[in-house]
Amino acid sequence: MDSEALVKEGLRVPAEVLDAVALAQKFQDPDWTAKGERRAMVALERLTTLWINTGTLCNITCRNCYIESSPTNDRLAYMTAAEAITFLDEAKALSETEEIGFTGGEPFLNPEFLIMLEAALDRGFSVLVLTNAMLPMQRPHIKAGLLALNKRFGKQLTLRVSLDHFTQELHEVERGAATWSKTLEGIDWLAANGIGIAIAGRTCWHEDDATARAGYAALIAVHGWSVTPSDRKQLVLLPEMDAGYDGPEITTKCWDILHKSPSDMMCASSRMVVKRKGADRPVVLPCTLLPYDTAFEMGETLTEAARADGGMFAIGAVKLCHKNCAKFCVLGGGSCS
């Protein structure tokens, strides 16, 4: 019985129970919303960015990590270099992909990460690495590897460092005590050695965009980092995930109402490869935001993923049947690229 039916039956039900019932009905049917409206979907227009998740293990535990990375979370296993290279070669053969994104967890914890990083660069891709720039990246052999790769590939490589606020206080609210100085140390080292950097912040601090960018601009100026705060690729401000999200589902009518296009969504131009703990092979997912929901597995190759049909897919198109699709991408305007 849905929440409207409970009311019609004249039952006295607490408001919080009605809210819970309504929430449970959302994002259930791949094709229809809880209100019976046709669910929106997004087709892959061109595989511009291929994300490779290197594993969910991380050196720290953040307050609100969308993928729940931590020193103990290994739900996504370490991708091996051989597995990653298989997808790099397939992406190269498809002749569409321009960028490889590596994410985790913390990519520099993966013992084979430098091998796969070199393989991506050697195949001519631009490469974006999402990192916290802390101790895993600052180990001597990792620094030596980064210096060698930067010397060979230069502007192909960018490390985007998570700096959740431009103040130590709020950054450490999210990341924990003693994370600020080590992160700044990592960014300073990258900048001093001419390695491409970008910054990823958050929008959960009740600041408008201009205020946030001005705050980061002041910090960037003090350190002399080569980052342009007004450039939304160089300073990315990400909306929050919310497990209890109770906002609207996205219907086919929403594109016109919101003045947005399916082409603007991350899944119109990207896919992510993950390897689940205990799995024999990696699988392809629509994007970086759906790491654990097996209903969104599209196949074991990029070619299979392009033909995924049934359930959450329609001949490769992705049905927006997840709260992260609504809150982060469509309504939040977020993108990991």
Where are these regions (language model features)?
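Intrinsically disordered, serine/threonine/proline
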Residues: 1-13
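Intrinsic disorder/low-complexity detector
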Residues: 2, 18, 26, 297, ...
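Conserved alpha-helical substructure of the radical SAM core
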Residues: 10-103, 108-118, 123-126
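Short, flexible loop/turn motifs enriched in small residues
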Residues: 58, 154-155, 265
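Canonical radical SAM enzyme core domain
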Residues: 72-86, 107-151, 159, 163-185, ...
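Conserved C-terminal portion of the radical SAM core fold
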Residues: 95-101, 153-163, 178-247
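Accessory C-terminal segments flanking Radical SAM cores
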Residues: 221, 239-337
